[in-house]
Structures are given as C-alpha cells and as structure tokens.
UniProtKB/Swiss-Prot annotation:
Cleaved signal peptide residues: none
Chain intervals with Low complexity compositional bias: 877-891, 898-923, 943-954
UniProt source species: Mus musculus (Mouse)
Subunit (UniProt): Interacts with RNF41/NRDP1.
Protein name, per record: Protein CLEC16A
Gene name of the record: Clec16a
Length: 1036
C-alpha cells in the first residue's frame, strides 16, 4: 500500500504538470477511492490528498467544464465522503474532510453545480453526523461548514435543507444547539446562521411555521435565560471589583451583552411578524421587566428572585434603548418605566403555561425546564406522530391553521392576564386597581409582595420607577447613578421606535418636536443642580455627566422658534456659569501651559462631541468614579487628579456652561476660539507688503529642498512670501504658521542660520504634535540672522501674551496691556505706524467703533485715581504718543476689549495673584521699571498723607518713571465725569464711554513734581527716561 501511495503521488505529480484539472484526472481519483474504501493508518494520507484533489477539480469544473459535475453525480462520489466519516477514522481525517467541504462550498458559484452537490441529501447526513465536538478544531471547521452552507440559502436551495414532509431542518436545528457554546466565535457563527435562515423563511410559509411552532419558543426561552445569566455574572463582577482589578473580565461581559442586543435587534429588523411576536414577549416577560426594570424599584438582593444592582440595571436599559428600535418592544418597556406601577406575580415554574405556548403568561426570570436540545427532540417526535396520522402532506396547511388558531387563543388569554401583572395607573381607573389588588392576593405570593400590592391600591398615580429615576439624579455626593439616568433618558428620547406621546405625557425631551411651550421643570432643576455642582471647586461631577446634562437641557427648552426656559431657571444657570468663571480664575496663570490647555480643551470639545453610544460601550463607567489616571479610564469619564487635570476640568466646565448659556439666550459665540481660521493668513494669499519689515532668507527643508523666500512676522503668524510678479510691493504667501507653536534654535557652526520648527496643534492632549515646518533658514549675514531670531522670539511671546489677555477678558480679569508690537516701542506716531503688522490695519480702525464693545469697570482702579488721570491726560495731550489700538481690542468680550490704558494702568497698580511677572515685556534694549514696587510705595505715601495733592503727585510721578515701552497705545476717549458734590473720583467715573461735552471734562492745567520716595522705591535714571510735559495741578 505504501508503494502504491508513492507510485500515485509520483505519477500524479508528473501528470498534474500536464493536466491536473481535467475529467480524466477525476476519473483516476475515483478509481483511487474505490480501491481504498476502508480507512487505515497506511492510506489515510492518500485519502485526504485524494479528497483535496477532487475538490480542486470540482471548483475548476464549476468555471470551465460542466461534465465534471455530471461524472461526480453519476458516480455518487459523495457517498465515499460519508462512508469515510462513518468509519470513525479519527480526528485527522474528519478535520481534513470538513475543511475540504468548506472550501468546496465557498468557491462554488454556479447554482447548477450547487444543486449537484446538495442533491441526494448527503449534505444533511454530514450535518447530523455525530462529530467529536470536544475537539476544538473539529468544532471550528464544523460550525464554519454550517455557516458557509447558510450563506448559500435562497428560495431555491432552501428546499435541499428543509424537508416539509418530515418537518426537519437539520442546518438550523443543529446550529442553534451551540447558541451557548463557551467559545465566542462559535456563538457568533450560530447567530449568523440563524439570521440567514430567518431571512429566507420570509418567502417560505411552511418553513416559517416550522421555525415558529417547533423551535422559536424553546430557542428564545433558552436564549433569554442565557442572556440573563450573563447579566447576573456582570452584576457580580461589578459588585466585587472594588479596586478595578476585574476590568478585563467586565469589559468582556459588557461586550457580550452588546452582542446579544445587536443580535436581537437584527432578528427584529428582519420584520418577520411571527418571530417578532414570540421574541418580544419573551424579552419583555422573561428578561427586561423581571430582571432589569424590577431591580430599579427594589435593588435589594435579599429576595427570592434574582435581581441586579441599580447602576447595572440603568446601564443595561440604556443599552437596550440605544440599540433596539422595535416599536412594540420599546414602547411596552418605556410604558412600564415611565407610567407603570408593577405588581409582581410570581408562581412556581410548574404552574407556568406549557412551553409550547407562544406567550408565557407569568412575568418572571426563571430557567427553562428543559434544555434546548431536549425540547427540539420532543417537538421533532411530535411532528412525526402527527405526520403518521396525516400521511398526505397536502393537509399540512390545515394543521397550521389549527395551530395558528390555538396560538391566537393563547395570546388572548395572555392579554387578559396582563391586567394581573401590570396596571397603568390613571385617574378615574381605581376600579382596575382594586381588581388588580384582589387578583394579586389570590396568587401564591410572598408577604412582602402582598403588602406592596395592597399599598398600590391606595395610590391614584404611582410611578415608582420614574420616581427612582429622578431621585438618582439628585445625588449631591457624586454622579455615579446620575450618569446612567441621563444616558437612559437620552436613549429613550432618541429611540426611533418610541412613541413621542409617551414622552410628552411626562414632558420628557423629544428631539423631533418642532414647537413646544412647556418642559419638565423637575428634570430641568435636577439638570441645573448637576451643572452647579460641577462648577464647584470640590465638585465630583464628571465631564461626561455635565455634557450630557447640557445636551438634555437644550433638548428640553430649545425650539426652532426660540427658547422656552423660565427666567428663574435661566438665572440659576447663569449662576452656575458665574461659578465656572470663578473656578477657572483660580487656575488662571501667565504660564504657557495654561494657554495650551485652554486651546486644546476647546479644540477637543468641538472636534469630539459626546457620543452616548460609545459612552455606553465603555465598561469602566460601571465602576465607582475614580480619580487616578493609572486605571486608563478616559479623562471625561473619571475625576481629575492633580493640578493639571483640575485645570483642564475647570476649563472644560467653563466652555460647556458658557456655550449652553449663549445658546439659551440666543447669542452667537464671538470670542472663541482664540484663533479663528478666517482671521489667519493662508497659503496663496496676496498681501500688501509695502512698508513692512521683510528679511530675505534661503529655506532648506528636511528633504534637501532649497528655495528663496522673504520672512514676514505678523501679529499671530510668521509667513514665507515671494514677490508677486503682477504688482510691485505685494507678495504671495507660500507658508504661514502660528508663532505660538514655533521653536527657534541657532545652528552651532553657522551664525547666519536658524533651525525653525512649527508644530500643528494636536487633536488631543495625549497625541504627539505633528511638525508642519521643519527647516533651516539661512540669512545673508549674522546681523539679519540675529534680527530674525529676535523678531520671531518676541513675536511668539507677543502672540501668546495677547491670547492670555483675551482669556483674561473672557474671565473678567484685569488686563495688563501689551504695549509693544513685535518688540518695537511706540515712541512716535510715524514709527508706530511704520512697524505695525501689515495684516491688521482694518482691525485697528474698527477697534474703537465696534458696536459689540462693552464697558468695563475694574475694582482696583480707584486705589490711586490720580495715577490714571495723569496718565490719561498725558497720553491725550501728547500727539507723539498716539497710535492705533491693539488688534485684540475689537474682539474682547465683556467690555474688556474697550479697556483704555487708564483702566490698564489702574488695574496694574494693584498687585494681583492672577498676573504673572512673565507678562511684563522685558527686553535687553529697554529696561523695565519695577512697577509694582513703585506703586506700593505710592500707595504707602498716599495712606500716610491722605490729601488730594499727594494723590495727584504720586500718580504724576508714576507716569514720569515709565519707559517708552510701557506707555500704552491710544485707546477710545476717556471721560472722567465730573460732579460738583463729589470730593474724589469714584470707580464708576473711570469708564470708557463715547466722547462727551467739553464742560463735563475735568480740566488739568498742571502737574506737580513727585515727592521723594523711600530708598527702597527709588529707580535708576534709565528707568525714568520719560519726562512728560509739566502741567499745573488741579484742585477739586
């Protein structure tokens, strides 16, 4: 035999090189099979290779030669495959045979060839063969074989698998026996097979009745019990995982539950009415209501019936409403949660209706009395007995009519008993409640259940589940339960199958509702309370909870025509927003990291809004909120840890509440983001570069490219331009990048070169920034190189400082003025206009006339009012110090954009913890005075001699000692309103207003000299370089 095998392999090889895919070769292989009908250790390899070769020839013949299948069918070659299996030839031959059959059916494309293979019922014989399923490899190839066959199902091929005369459907019944297999890939394959069968059954009434009457109830009841067992295991995992040690197992259990729900939804989507009725009834009465919903009212696990904890119940119900949209199911479930008063009626399993009934009448989570395999076998034998009584298969339709009639009767009986189980308590229906109470007492219930049913009789309108939902929202300690409640409300309101009238009845938000005049005040107050708690320094509200609260509140009160929120609720919301402003003020710093965090958080919030579906896929939120990042939980789903994360959280809370406030008030967002794309220079823009500072350079990119460009520095950006050939003095932008994201370093061996890198802002705080420019800039000499480096470095500092000022304006903080533009002191009107950036002339002109500019009053201004007066008058009286207002003035919020240099000077006179010394512009060319020290000295002097003249002298001396770089640019006109009855200037008098009549202005004719300051406050001559024109002091 061994010699024959060697001869066949050798001869086959030489022949295969000539024509291995041919009818002649198939005849030769048939001859080999006839000579080796018994499997032995010596010939099993030969048989396996022969089967493989036959498969290759069949696949080739399917595309090229139909005579191959004629010969295969004529010689009945499938019998050899079946005989090999029945000989118990060992796992090796079984595995190879199943693998070969799987490949064969996967690659057959012509239906005629498929009919040849499926004829004579040999495939069904292989399906029902008793394989050793304890072998994982055999199990894998077997279920894969069934899955491949199910994919070939259609209206024609289904008759080869389903025999309506014998009431047998081996492909389906053998597959569903593995619905609870421990291997997840096997369970997934079973679901695919059943879905393929259900889709085909829509066009085959006989098969549909078989599935409904013989398999639906046993399969769905066992499936529901299997899902519920997983849910109880999930709940136990949550309850025992105090240290987040079982997160891997918990994630697997949550993923399994999601797979179950998607599978159930796929069955319901097929829209097979018979199946949907049976499945919906089993899900409601055997799983969702007794296990999920009943656990909401009484989460105590001490009772006889299985229950799960409140957070797990809310979490799973949210998943149900997010995934399943079958209207009868979700409306029945929502009716119980929103309006139902449940009277639980449990009986023993022996008192249940028969398992063959289409409707289980008792609402409880119990284990089926029989296994699925046993139930299928019993139904199969019952069908055979009936077939013996009715040998004529044409009478099958009559039998189905009788079964359908009995099923309808059972359905009517079940609907009658529903009044015993659940009563929707409405006004004027107390008789129903009393009837329900008496019927409940007649059941075999526990004393606890009887007392609960008796108490329900006395209530006209009892909604225990809805009350629990609202109660879970009102938890001041943390948001553990609140997050799940919000997800449940969101899922119910966004469910496509939900009846809007059910939600409107209790005034829950309906996103599709165009017009609304009222909303749920209780829910709105709970949501605003969550927002207020989130804005507290010690608040334990996670960002995900806050964002979901804002989303639900907007759904409640916003309509297409406006906002219907009550003034009292809007006032409470504004109070929460103010709290968030104070919270961010606590973390406001002059450091660079705050600006980066501020922009990153805004970018993250706008680019990645909350997706509730993804949120409910995360098993980590089932665990109590933790504050450590070591768990790997996303930042928005846990509490902050450390100052950096607390800063990020405070910024995000501020953004959310600010956005919500603006939307409810119908106002547009005009101040965020800090960098607007429409205001930036873009590639291929054509700019007027006349009178602009340009530095010629050679740009050498990382890949070795070399181009000639001109370097121009703008307020926020650096640009590389080339001359425009059509207009003299104009340039075309070839690259533009933000100064704040730039890094400049020198080149060690070349004093004329700089290494410049500009990074693109990261999409998330954890991602690595991507460099959009990484090149070496070579200038003509080292002087131009130094100038370029200085201009870029100062431009970067200036850009970041201006954005910090805009953040300060958002937070209503005093603004320290930026008095330099790119390092050039504003010494004269000509020099200032010459060095202003080329991009922002129009914005400067709009700054003082912008109608959006509001007035701002800083409380620290009145400490040294004479200082502000002297500075203002000096600036207005000296034309050499006038210049346009900074560009950020036009966009500043809350009045801070119109803040004059008087306001700025006054605010800087008081030391503030919110300002950083790094904000003061310091350059080697222009030494800065110690402004805080001199002001403190002036205040001490004023406090020791409380006279009007000393106040004026201290303020005048402060102006005398300011360097040119500290003199602010000209701002909108200052009006110091004068009252004859006032002794001193008030805070309200120092306000930016439009120009007033001359007689209302205080006239200052002279300024006296500053008295000598203590030695500790004296300044060097270089620090007092500016000597304003003397003026006569005024008296009030």
């Amino acid at each position: 035999m061994f010699g024959r095998s060697r001869s066949w392999v050798g001869g086959g090889h030489s022949k295969s090189s000539r024509n291995i895919h041919s009818l002649d070769h198939l005849k030769y292989l048939y001859h080999v099979l006839t000579k080796n009908t018994t499997v032995t250790e010596q010939n099993r390899n030969l048989l396996v290779e022969t089967i493989r070769s036959i498969t290759e020839i069949l696949i080739w013949g399917d595309q090229n030669d139909s005579s191959v299948f004629d010969f295969f069918l004529e010689k009945n070659m499938f019998v050899f495959f079946l005989n090999i299996l029945r000989q118990k030839s060992g796992r090796y031959v079984c595995v190879q045979l199943l693998q070969t059959l799987n490949i064969l059916f996967e690659n057959i494309s012509h239906e005629t060839s498929l009919y040849y293979l499926l004829s004579n019922n040999y495939v069904n014989s292989i399906i029902v063969h008793k394989f050793d399923f304890s072998d994982e490899e055999i199990m894998a190839y077997y279920i894969s074989f069934l899955k491949t066959l199910s994919l070939k199902l259609n209206n024609h091929t289904v008759h080869f698998f389903y025999n309506e005369h014998t009431n047998d459907f081996a492909l389906y019944t053998e597959a569903i026996k593995f619905f609870n297999h421990p291997e997840s890939m096997v369970r997934i394959a079973v679901r695919t097979i059943t879905l393929n069968v259900y889709k085909v059954s829509l066009d085959n009434q006989a098969m549909l009745h078989y599935i409904r009457d013989k398999t639906a109830v046993p399969y769905f009841s066992n499936l529901v019990w299997f899902i519920g067992s997983h849910v109880i295991e999930l709940d136990n995992c949550v309850q025992t995982d105090e240290e987040h040690r079982n997160r891997g197992k918990l994630s697997d259990l949550v993923a399994e539950h999601l797979d179950h729900l998607h599978y159930l939804n796929d069955i319901l989507i097929i829209n097979c009415e018979f199946l949907n009725d049976v499945l919906t009834d089993h899900l409601l009465n055997r799983l969702f209501l007794p296990l999920y919903v009943y656990s909401l009212e009484n989460p105590d696990k001490g009772g006889e019936r299985p229950k799960i904890s409140l957070p797990v119940s809310l979490y799973l119900l949210s998943q149900v409403f997010l995934i399943i949209h079958h209207a009868p199911l979700v409306n029945s479930l929502a009716e119980v949660i929103l309006n139902g008063d449940l009277s639980e009626t449990y009986t023993k399993p022996a008192q249940d209706v028969p398992r063959s009934s289409a409707k289980p009448s008792i609402r409880c989570f119990i284990k089926p009395t029989e296994t699925l395999e046993r139930s299928l076998e019993m139904n199969k034998h019952k069908g055979k007995k009936r077939m013996q009584k009715r040998p004529n298969y044409k009478n099958v339709g009559e039998e189905e009519d009788e079964e359908r009639g009995s099923a309808e009767d059972a359905q009517e009986d079940a609907e009658k008993t529903k009044e015993i189980e659940m009563v929707i308590m409405k006004l004027g229906k107390l008789s129903e409640v009393a009837a329900a109470g008496t019927s409940v007492q007649e059941q075999n219930t526990t004393d606890e259940e009887k007392s609960a049913a008796t108490n329900s009789e006395n209530a006209q309108w009892s909604r225990p589940f809805l009350d629990m939902v609202y109660h879970a929202l009102d938890s001041p300690d943390d948001d553990y339960h609140a997050l799940f409640v919000l997800c449940l409300l969101y899922a119910m309101s966004h469910n496509k199958g939900m009846d809007p009238e059910k939600l409107k009845r209790i005034q829950l938000p309906v996103p599709s509702e165009a017009e609304k005049t009222t909303y749920n005040h209780l829910l709105a107050e709970r949501l605003i309370r969550i927002m207020n708690n989130a804005a507290q320094p010690d608040g334990r509200i996670r960002l995900a909870t806050l964002e979901l609260s804002c989303l639900l509140l907007k759904q409640q009160v916003l309509t297409s025509s406006g906002c219907v929120i009550k003034d009292v609720h809007l006032a409470c919301l504004e109070g929460a927003r103010e709290e968030s402003v104070h919270l961010v003020r606590h973390f406001y710093k002059g450091e660079e990291i705050f600006l980066d965090m501020f922009e990153d958080e805004y970018r993250s919030m706008t680019i990645k809004p909350m997706n509730v579906e993804y949120l409910m896929m995360d098993a980590s939120i089932l665990l109590p909120p933790t504050g450590t990042p070591l768990t790997g939980i996303d930042f928005v789903k846990r509490l902050p840890c450390g100052d950096v994360e607390k800063t990020r959280r405070a910024i995000r809370v501020f953004f959310m509440l600010r956005s919500l406030s603006l939307q409810l008030r119908g106002e547009p967002e005009t101040q965020l983001p800090l960098t607007r794309e429409e205001d930036l220079i873009k590639t291929d823009d054509v700019l007027d570069l006349n009178n602009s500072d340009l530095i010629a350079c050679t740009v050498i990119t990382k890949d070795g490219g070399m181009v000639q460009r001109f370097l121009a520095v703008d307020i926020y950006q650096m640009s590389l331009v080339e001359p425009d050939v059509s207009r003299l003095g104009w340039g075309v932008v070839k690259f533009a990048g933000l100064l704040q994201d730039m890094q400049v370093t020198g080149v060690e061996d070349d004093s004329r070169a700089l290494n410049i890198t500009i990074h693109k802002p990261a999409s998330s705080p954890h991602s690595k920034p991507f460099p959009i420019l990484q090149a070496t800039f070579v200038f003509s000499d080292h002087i131009r190189c130094i100038i370029a480096k200085q201009r870029l470095a100062k431009g970067r500092i200036q850009a970041r400082r201006m954005k910090m000022q805009r953040i300060a304006a958002l937070l209503d903080l005093p603004i320290q003025p930026t008095t330099e533009v790119l390092g050039f002191g504003l010494c004269s009107s000509s020099s200032s206009s010459q060095h202003l950036p080329f991009r922002f002339y129009e914005q400067c002109r709009r700054g003082s006339s912008d109608p959006t500019v509001q007035r701002s009053v800083f409380a620290s201004v009145d400490k040294v009012p004479g200082f502000a007066v002297a500075q203002c008058i000096n600036q207005h009286s000296s034309p050499s110090l006038s210049s346009p207002s900074p560009p950020f003035a036009s966009g500043s919020p809350g009045g801070s954009g119109s803040t004059s240099h008087c306001d700025s000077g006054g605010s800087s006179s008081a030391p503030s913890a919110t300002q950083s010394p790094a904000d003061a512009p310091t350059t080697p060319e222009q030494p800065q005075p110690h402004l805080d020290q001199s002001v403190i000295g002036n205040e001490m002097d004023v406090n020791s001699k409380p006279s009007k003249n000393s106040s004026a002298r201290s303020s005048e001396g402060e102006t005398m000692h300011l360097s040119p770089s500290l003199l602010p640019a000209q701002q909108p006109t200052i009006s110091l309103l004068y009252e004859d009855t006032a002794d001193t200037l008030s805070v309200e008098s120092l306000t930016i207003v439009p120009p007033v009549d001359p007689h209302s202005l205080r006239a200052l004719s002279g300024i006296s000299q500053l008295p000598t300051l203590p030695a500790a406050d004296t300044e060097t001559p270089a620090e007092g370089a500016v000597n304003p024109e003397p003026a006569e002091p005024t008296e009030h």
